Structure formats: C-alpha cells, structure tokens
Amino acid sequence: MQLTKQEQKMLDGEEGYAVQKSMEILTALGDIYGAKNLITVSSVQVAGVSYHNLGDAGLEFLNELAKDGRVKVLTTLNPAGMDLENWQQLGISPEFAEKQNLLIDAFERMGILVSCTCTPYLIGNLPLYGEHLAWSESSAVTFANSVIGAKTNREGGPSALAAAFVGKTPCYGLHLDENRIPDVHVQVNAEIAKLSDWGALGYAIGKKAENKISYITGIKSVDLDELKSFCASVVTYGAKPLFYMKGVTPGTELQTQPKETVIIEQADIKNAYDNINDFVTDIELVCVGCPHCSVNEISKVAELLRGKKVAEG
C-alpha cells in the first residue's frame, strides 16, 4: 500500500505507540483487501466495548493504547456490557461492573465520546453525504451507507479504533464507487403498515437478496424510525450493509436498475413473522430499544404505559 511521508512516520513510531500500532493494523488490513492507499475519515464508531467480549487482555491492551493515544476525529462508542448508571438494579455483579467501568475510563482517556449507543446518528455523530467513515455497528453502517449516502465498511472494533487514532482507513470495499453498484432489484408489493413490518421486510429482503446490494422500489412512505428498524433487520438476515431505496437513498436515480428482480409479497411478510416470533406463554423480560430508541419512540412507549403498572418480576 502506498503511504505518504507522514503516514510512514506514523508507522515508524514517530507519533507514539498507539498511532504506530494503529498504522500496523490499518496497513495489514489494507494489504489483505488490496487497498492502494489510506483515505481520511470524518468520524468513527467503535464496537467491542463490553468486558464480556474483551476480558482482561482487552482491558490491558486498551490501557496501553490510552497512555499516549488520542483520537483525531469524532469518535463514539457502541453499547457497553451493562447500563453504566443502573447496573445494580439489573443484577450486574460488582466485579463485572468494576472491569466494565475501567474499560470505559480507558476509552474516555482516548478522547472518545462515551455515548454507548448503536445509533450514533441520533446523538451527534451524523455524517454528510459522500463522507468516508470507519463505523463498526452493522445497523449503523447500513444506515450511514443507505440513508445518508456516506461511505463505510463494516469495521471490526480494532480497525475502527485504529482509524480513530490515525484519522484514516484503508480505501477498499464500500469506499469505492465500483463496489456500491446494486446487484438485484427488489420490488415490494406487500403492504408495510406498522413499525414491526419494517423488521419483517428487512428479514424477507435479507433472505432473498442474500449477500447482494438491493435496489428497492414500491415503498410509498417511510420515516426515520422505520428506516432504523429496516437497516437493523436487512443486514442481520443476509444483505450487504448498503441498499438503494427509491425516494430515500441519495443518488439512487444515478444507479442503473439491476436485471435480476425479486418480488416481496404479503406472504413473505407473514413468513418473516412466523420465523422470527417466539411463541411463549411466560414473559420474564421486555427489552425496548434495539437499535436504541429515538426520542419519538421513547415518547410512544411512555404514552402506552401511561396510567399502567409494569408487572412484578
């Protein structure tokens, strides 16, 4: 990979340990995927925040990076392994909480905004059309590529953190226009009436489109919360973290409609519900906000609970 003189100095350790390690990660990644150079990113979103995933080895590594590592661009965090404020009420052990808080402290010393959310675009990390990013969380990556029209691969936690320290990422994959061309036309004939239908639609398209970029038509109207739900679902069940939705995605009119076509009928939506739903009689826990709720969604939940009491348990 071709490096500038400044990038080579970073790789040689002239800007400290954290930047050097980051350059080692980024150049190795670039070599693997055939990137010719690094490109500047406007923001980063880091996953791999939970102590459950990182353990003591991860904590030690992050503390080492935090000694001299400071992020060069706006950087936000994915959710941690617990609620940072109400962990005791949720039955989290003090031992786990202590280690999780040490991880958060390390990220904070790096200059990262400790947002702990999978919807960074709702809390200030909102990129512009065409900007290059290094984001990790799959639904957020899909939203950035498909709704905003920014450009990001689905980064791993280490590569995203490395991009934050350097301010750059290898130029490959969805950073390149030739890799952002739709492969399959998806015509939606089904009625998509409520929020959960968007999750079902994402399931149906993800299963049919598989690992392809969809050009979606037939959508009459959609709001931000519905797009958020759809992005989380479609990438979970098989599709690439980029789609073009006519009337939504910037630049859709510049894309050629693919020859391959799949149709989404009402039966596909019903099939999605049948496959996703777990039919249980006893519910122990209700979790709201995956991806994290918008203010509008929280307001709706509050309205539904007005004057009611949550069951004991």
Regions found by a protein language model. Give the residues of each.
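Non-transmembrane, aqueous-exposed alpha-helical and coiled segments at domain scale
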Residues: 1-313
